[in-house]
């Protein structure tokens, strides 16, 4: 993005500390995201669908630290004139990287939504690498289409005598900035909020069902007047009210000693016999199924929390800049007021590229193990018992 209000020449005592801090930020962004990329390359266990999207986010943030900030430091602090060619390259690259980072967050949130809300179908799908790469490439194409053509077309709008500031030609067109703010911020935030709400709603429903008593079995119905019977499968999640001490008989079904309980409930209204047959297999498997469901709920809650943190960081880092750009677009070029708050809002966008790798990938136990593997550390952290939950 471009800091369109310009910067006065600062004294050397201020330039050196600022240059050091800006360079430190660029270095931290580069190293943090490079670790994520290298961990993904070094550990094959990380190469599943969701981590590919985190890789896409790390790539865009990595080049923010390699290209966007290093080129901007001499321009803003030492009044280095880019020239039209470098200025155009920097504008397109910076807008592309920042927007691709935003759209990668949307793609990550959609993948999280699918893995929690449609867990069975999500795990049953075997998404090929080509489809995953196509989704990653689509993020970059959409990110370029948001600002790239407009930057190229608006270059002729700029005042040819004003070559000191490297900014797109539409910075004074409020309606264009409103559209780009909608595509870069409001729409992505709305989508991530929607996916987050759906995830929490799905987890709440699953948590409510898991607290209900569950009895699986078969219902066999027979008519008193005929010898025919019908057997149907049923999974009943609630107890039947009003049933008192039904007659029961225990019999063996197989040489292995599997037993089943046959409960005959005679109804006096329709003259039918309803039998609930609960097999020992269901009784033996229910603790395992309950434990698996509990693990899935814990995993879903962790994913929901990580997505909420990712959304909060994105909103905090991007909302001030979008608001400032729309407000400042109402001023004519060269008459826009200079504010330290605008500069802070401007740098917050790039700061988001620093915190993104620490919000999920570098806190993920598998990424940490891959990081130790990169450093060739023989003593790796002991795997946690909840590794299956965090993965």
From Swiss-Prot:
Xref: PROSITE patterns: G_PROTEIN_RECEP_F1_1, G_PROTEIN_RECEP_F1_2
Spans through the membrane: 20-40, 53-73, 88-108, 132-152, 175-195, 307-327, 344-364
Organism name: Rattus norvegicus
Gene Ontology MF term list: histamine receptor activity; neurotransmitter receptor activity
Subunit-structure text: Interacts with TSPAN4.
One GO biological process term: regulation of MAPK cascade
Compartments it resides in: Cell membrane
Entry keyword annotation includes Disulfide bond: yes
Disulfide pattern: 87-166
Name under which the protein is recorded: Histamine H4 receptor
Keywords: Cell membrane, Disulfide bond, G-protein coupled receptor, Glycoprotein, Membrane, Receptor, Transducer, Transmembrane, Transmembrane helix
Residues the record marks as carrying a glycan: 5, 159
Main location: membrane
């Amino acid at each position: 993005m471009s800091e369109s209000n310009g910067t006065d020449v600062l004294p050397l005592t201020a330039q050196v500390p600022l240059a050091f801090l800006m360079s430190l930020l660029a270095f931290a962004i580069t190293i943090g995201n490079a670790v994520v990329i290298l961990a993904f390359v070094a550990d094959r266990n990380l190469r599943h669908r969701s981590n590919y999207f985190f890789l896409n986010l790390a790539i865009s943030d990595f080049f923010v630290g390699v290209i966007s900030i290093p080129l901007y430091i001499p321009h803003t602090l030492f009044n280095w004139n880019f020239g039209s060619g470098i200025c155009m390259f920097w504008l397109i690259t910076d807008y592309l990287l920042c927007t691709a980072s935003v759209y990668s967050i949307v793609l990550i949130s959609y993948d999280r939504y699918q893995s929690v809300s449609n867990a069975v179908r999500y795990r049953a799908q075997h998404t090929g690498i080509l489809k995953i790469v196509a989704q990653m490439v689509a993020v970059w194409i959409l990110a370029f289409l948001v600002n790239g053509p407009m930057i190229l077309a608006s270059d002729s709008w700029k005042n040819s005598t004003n070559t000191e500031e490297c900014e797109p030609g539409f910075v004074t067109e409020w309606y264009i900035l409103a559209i780009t703010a909608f595509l870069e911020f409001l729409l992505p935030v709305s989508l991530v909020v929607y996916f987050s709400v759906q995830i929490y709603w799905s987890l709440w429903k699953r948590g409510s069902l898991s607290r209900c008593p569950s009895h699986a079995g078969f219902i066999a119905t027979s008519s008193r007047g005929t010898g025919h019977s019908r057997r149907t499968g049923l999974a009943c999640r609630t107890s039947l009210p009003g049933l008192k001490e039904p007659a029961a008989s225990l019999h063996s079904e197989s040489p292995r000693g599997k037993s089943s309980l046959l409960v005959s409930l005679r109804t006096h209204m329709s003259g039918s016999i309803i039998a609930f047959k609960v097999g020992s297999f269901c009784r033996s498997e229910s603790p395992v199924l309950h434990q698996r469901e509990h693990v899935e709920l814990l995993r879903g809650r962790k994913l929901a929390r990580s997505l909420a943190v990712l959304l909060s960081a994105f909103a905090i880092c991007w909302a001030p800049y979008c608001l400032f750009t729309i407000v400042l677009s109402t001023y004519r070029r060269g008459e826009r007021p200079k504010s330290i708050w605008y500069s802070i809002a401007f740098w917050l966008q790039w700061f988001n590229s620093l915190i993104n790798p620490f919000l999920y990938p570098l806190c993920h136990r598998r990424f940490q193990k891959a990081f130790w593997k990169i450093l060739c550390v023989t003593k790796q952290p002991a795997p946690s018992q909840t590794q299956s939950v965090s993965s």
